[in-house]
């Protein structure tokens, strides 16, 4: 875990499992230190630890929002790229709060959970599988950091009671964290960045208001989304990027009020309402990312590939904010269960 310290230094916290055949209950060893470099901090810990600490065994690196906001992650990561014994497959994760506090609480208070490193790895992998966050490892964080026209995105976690919750994702611009999105917004972003294929993404939809239906189960529906296709068209008009994002979804009604969904007219009405809802949320998400100057979709990279002369003439992050980006969504309900 890494967070800021006085004088521009780093507060580092290392959590390591204790492997002892005489100990029946799994436990960990935690070391807090402060240094100007991660390598120096590791040497400090090795002078105190009963076991030699090897960076190649690191599974997860937790950064505070302050460090992420200062744009320090890329430079801190340099040791993992330079030293072949270090782990470039470790997760890069931003913590809403103190990484030091999170590591200590996970070790001391999460008595009903697996070992902290295993627990965190499991919830991160599960969140990626449900499109609640994006998988980001050291190697692809560093690659995107040096690629023009695309910005990083990392998982965002937080302590919640006696557990850790994946809140969504942290968004970056020019190497600095500039915003966050929740788990549902991350699912929609995944459909525009990559694809929802092989993901189990459940969308929390709101239904058309009906008189005398005030309970939440009457006003909402859980729809499991499947992505059929994605297409992004990029062009330059009047010296401005024009981008059209086409998304085609189908879905299952996992949870829905008792209704006549076996009626084709009702299904069509549902399709149209839900299609418009997803389109509006995707458009709202695009506008938010433009406002904060974050381009995790890599629209700039597409402009660079197709209109390289134009890309070289402009400052992409400034141009991106005023680009005309429009989302187009199709949706069709394919399964809803037999309730009659």
Language-model regions: role of each:
Residues 1-340:
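Membrane-proximal alpha-helical signals and transmembrane carboxylates
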